[in-house]
Amino acid sequence: LRRRGELVDKIELVVASSEPASALASLADLPETVGMVDIQDDCGILQLGSGPRLEVLVSTPAQFPWALWRGTGSQKHIDHLQAFAQKLGLKLDEEGIWVNGTQVVPASEAALYELVGLPFIPPEIREGRGEIEAASEDALPHLVELSDIRGDLHCHSRWSDGVLTIEEVAQAAQAKGYEYVAICDHSQSLKIANGLSPERLRQQHQQILHIREQLGFNLLSGIEVDILGDGSLDLLDSVLAERDVVVASIHSGFRQDEQQLTNRVIKAMENPHVDIIGHPTGRLLGRRSPYSINMEQVMQRAAITGSVLEINASPDRLDLNDVHTQMARSMGVKIAINTDAHSQVELDNMQDRKSVV
């Protein structure tokens, strides 16, 4: 949970208490608890009424920072820090940190990292993918905060399959302090989502211009245009050229082979009117695996064309993932964090995805 993982099969909590037996006994009174699966001296496993099981580890108050750090993981991060500390003559094990045979109890996670000569490493990047080396070189990346987000470039309205009016989307974006928001409804081939024809798109554009002037807000006229089976786009270039923002996405033909799918996306990026590739791997968490696509090839081309790849903040997608985002960063590819919101509540999904950046 602290590492903001995409999927979890259990909830692990660390509790500080000088009376572990009493703390564990009180867990049975939690409102979502339907039964105690197992209980030991300092650990309890509970079944919840819905969702994954709950595992609770009780630590003494003094040992809480250490227990929290180990519980947060990842195991690769723990292993790498143990190896790093060993080179300094320190020992890290399940009980704590040892200096010359004497246990040292850190007062916080920050103090723990300080003992091994490192700055605090945020939980979101404790994945064992170079963060310890980066910390040792004072090169940890900046994690994006909500205050860093300036706008949302992929929102839907009632004109296609959203539930908000264009004005409601704009007002919600204003309330969040955004500088801009883009209306990117679906294009005509996605009939199930009430996709827009060129004529409807021009009508919508006029409404956007009116609301933009009325609110004095940078409301952008966009489109989420379908990438068709051969890599061509669902709308003519002359129509796309009239848009402020063009998001190109695949919504069909997922079973093509890897090179076909890769070529489709690359061909779309080579269109000068395409700004962003939406949800680039097409996954739906728990329902549909990512389609076969060579993201390294895609990013190599994106770095040349200047195309932006989306981090789609929909909880069903979270696409790009953290691995691909790190790859994009290393290759100089631009990223846009968008909500793909179809409703008021979905505009808040920005909170879930900003952490991956």
What are these regions (language model features)?
Residues 2-157, 163-177, 181-183, 188-218, ...:
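Charged catalytic cores and adjacent phosphate/nucleic-acid-binding surfaces used
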Residues 221-223:
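Short loop/edge segments at beta-strand edges and connector loops
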